[in-house]
Amino acid sequence: MKILEQRIKKDGRVLGKDVLKVDSFLNHQVDPELMQAMGEEFATIFSDEKIDKIVTVESSGIAPAVFAGLALHVPVVFARKNKSLTLPENVWTADVYSFTKQTTNHIMIDHRFLSAAENILIIDDFLANGQAVEGLLKIANDANANVVGVGVVIEKTFQKGRQILDERGVRVESLARIKGFENDEVIFL
């Protein structure tokens, strides 16, 4: 998606050899017009699938997931990273390691919001090592839901996430695919 690649080149910041900071439009401050364009792009890409619900992980996956849900006219559910007093005991769970934060999160989705035979589209902000998506796949599997695909805003192809999902036979569609970083510049595929 050219508009996203241009925005990454303009406002993304490379930190070290494998971290891209996009907090000015995706991970801290959100550009709603860009999110709308991405949501519409996901809707076009997955127009051949019957989708009942979109699933993501809080918090950076929420904005692109909501705009994809708006474009597809389906609800969005996000896995919580922390159990609140209002969350019931009946939840689907998975442990997800965060490469960026160097912590493991115990993500959860209320049983009421994910059911057997629902067709699920997973949307996430980044695909790097694939941990967040793996956690959501586990939750969907535990709920006997059908994952029709994974939509990723930014994929770091030099990390193993895509390979893991390909080996599992999961359809993955990315809006921007990064080959690597050179001299603090993003190199796209």
Curated annotation (Swiss-Prot):
Binding site for 5-phospho-alpha-D-ribose 1-diphosphate: 128-132
Gene Ontology BP terms: purine ribonucleoside salvage; xanthine metabolic process; XMP salvage
Known catalytic reactions: XMP + diphosphate = xanthine + 5-phospho-alpha-D-ribose 1-diphosphate
Record-linked CDD domains: PRTases_typeI (cd06223)
InterPro entries in the record: PRibTrfase_dom (IPR000836), PRTase-like (IPR029057), Pur/Pyrimidine_PRTase (IPR050118), Xanthine_PRibTrfase (IPR010079)
Binding site for xanthine: 20, 27, 156
One cellular-component annotation, GO: cytoplasm
SUPFAM superfamilies associated with the record: PRTase-like
Pathway noted in the entry: Purine metabolism; XMP biosynthesis via salvage pathway; XMP from xanthine: step 1/1
Single GO MF annotation: xanthine phosphoribosyltransferase activity
Catalytic activity, EC: 2.4.2.22
Subcellular location: Cytoplasm
Top-rank taxon, per record: Bacteria
Keyword list, A-Z: Cytoplasm, Glycosyltransferase, Purine salvage, Transferase
Name of the top EC class for this enzyme: transferase
Known function: Converts the preformed base xanthine, a product of nucleic acid breakdown, to xanthosine 5'-monophosphate (XMP), so it can be reused for RNA or DNA synthesis.
Subunit comment: Homodimer.
UniProt similarity note: Belongs to the purine/pyrimidine phosphoribosyltransferase family. Xpt subfamily.
Name listed for the protein in its UniProt record: Xanthine phosphoribosyltransferase
